[in-house]
């Protein structure tokens, strides 16, 4: 397994381009199964999860065509099997997203119960109950979800999500595009990635209103046609590089970004003492060599502070002036990075869903281990400002969500290299 070796203490300075959003690209790829003509998706990030989704399509008989710019054309008419097998699904939770489109378009699906990041219970029952409300018959047996549409296809339904679920909202919204009649999804996720998926579906001919609010209305149509669609910029990758500059007292300009999707994060960075300037598709952060100030934050569904930026801000607080409290309300068991940071000399106390972080002057390099995607990114940030060398193991977690992380950080001046395990 590859490792990263980072020599800390370098003030980052420079410009980088932001990749397409993984959390938007995966549902949008799943949505291509709904089309009865080829659909082309552009600005896909070059990530392991994307490769897994494309491999899953290949296993089902859909052979995506990939060009040199990593645009992917999918023609779902060539599908041969409606099974998403365990050996692919186990590595990536997002593979559950093919369930709704397959049942809606082909009348049945068999999808293995998913794997992915080990951060608490992320139940798939909302996906199942949403499809059942639309008339699907679903059995869970042998580790597989087996779903069948009623005769005549799925029917529009009024569905209330007990818990805000991004992938649940996406799956049911996709299924509803081809259902007969109107579907109303209440307490729906409002994330920008949900809006991006809705925009892609609309480009394919779907009738969707209210994406980005907590009530989404979908009027089913007979068919969805081909389209060409650009995936939105990755707001979590954007935030991570902004924090990287902030913790090192440096400056960064991120291009091909979307400031409107990051308001809660930008507000906290300003509170930490960063000077921030934005344009239509860029953000510049400058710490002017200063040490950040500790911030208090509480994660919650969009538009509040994103859980996927929590670990990065714990790294920021770890070297900030003062004490900051971080409350995690979205996932349980999401402070695994804290125990690795303690090995580097951080002063962090975890009580239930709260981490109390008192900043220290300097962290010290140490061997650490990545446990999940965002936790691993926070260890990279901690290493960038630590004294000496940090060796980060199990970085396949990082590769699931960050395209070319070492190359981008090298562009900003970081001393970072990948070594084979």
UniProtKB/Swiss-Prot annotation:
Name listed for the protein in its UniProt record: UDP-N-acetylglucosamine 1-carboxyvinyltransferase
Organism: Ectopseudomonas mendocina (strain ymp) (Pseudomonas mendocina)
Role noted for this protein: Cell wall formation. Adds enolpyruvyl to UDP-N-acetylglucosamine.
Enzyme class: transferase
Subcellular location: Cytoplasm
Keyword Ribosomal protein appears in the UniProt entry: no
Cited InterPro entries: Enolpyruvate_Tfrase_dom, Enolpyruvate_Tfrase_sf, MurA_subfamily, RNA3'P_cycl/enolpyr_Trfase_a/b, UDP_GlcNAc_COvinyl_MurA
PANTHER family: UDP-N-ACETYLGLUCOSAMINE 1-CARBOXYVINYLTRANSFERASE
């Amino acid at each position: 397994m590859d490792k990263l070796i980072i020599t800390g203490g370098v003030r980052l300075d420079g410009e980088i381009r932001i990749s397409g959003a993984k959390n938007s690209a995966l549902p949008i790829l799943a949505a291509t199964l709904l089309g009865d003509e080829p659909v082309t998706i552009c600005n896909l990030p070059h990530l392991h999860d994307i490769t897994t989704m494309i491999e899953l399509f290949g296993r089902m008989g859909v052979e995506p065509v990939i060009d040199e710019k990593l645009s992917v054309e999918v023609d779902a008419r060539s599908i041969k099997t409606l099974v998403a097998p365990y050996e692919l699904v186990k590595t990536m939770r997002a593979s559950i997203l093919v369930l709704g489109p397959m049942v809606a378009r082909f009348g049945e699906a068999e999808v293995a119960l998913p794997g992915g990041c080990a951060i608490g219970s992320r139940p798939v029952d909302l996906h199942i109950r949403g499809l059942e409300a639309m008339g699907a018959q679903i059995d869970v047996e042998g580790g597989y979800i087996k779903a069948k549409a009623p005769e005549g296809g799925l029917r529009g339904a009024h569905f209330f999500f007990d818990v805000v679920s991004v992938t649940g909202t996406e799956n049911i919204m996709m299924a509803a595009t081809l259902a007969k009649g109107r579907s109303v999804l209440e307490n729906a996720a409002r994330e920008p990635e949900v809006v991006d998926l809705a925009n892609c579906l609309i480009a394919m001919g779907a009738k969707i209103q209210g994406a980005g609010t907590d009530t989404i209305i979908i009027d089913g149509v007979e068919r969805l046609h081909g389209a060409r669609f650009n995936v939105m910029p990755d707001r979590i990758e954007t935030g991570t590089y902004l924090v990287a500059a902030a913790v090192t007292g440096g400056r960064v300009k991120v291009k091909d970004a979307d400031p409107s999707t990051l308001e809660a994060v930008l507000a906290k960075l300003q509170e930490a003492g960063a000077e921030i300037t934005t344009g239509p598709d860029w953000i510049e952060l400058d710490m002017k060599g200063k040490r950040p100030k500790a911030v208090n934050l509480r994660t919650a569904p969009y538009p509040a502070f994103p859980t996927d930026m929590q670990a990065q801000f714990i790294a920021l607080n770890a070297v900030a002036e003062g004490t900051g409290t971080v409350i995690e309300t979205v996932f349980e068991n999401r402070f695994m990075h804290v125990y690795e940071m303690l090995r580097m000399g951080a002063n962090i106390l975890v009580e239930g869903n709260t981490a109390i972080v008192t900043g220290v002057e300097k962290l010290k390099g140490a061997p650490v281990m990545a446990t999940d995607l965002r936790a691993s990114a926070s260890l990279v940030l901690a290493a960038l400002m630590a004294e000496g060398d940090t060796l980060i193991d199990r970085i396949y977690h990082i590769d699931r969500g960050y395209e070319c992380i070492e190359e981008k950080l090298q562009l900003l001046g970081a001393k970072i290299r990948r070594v084979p395990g």
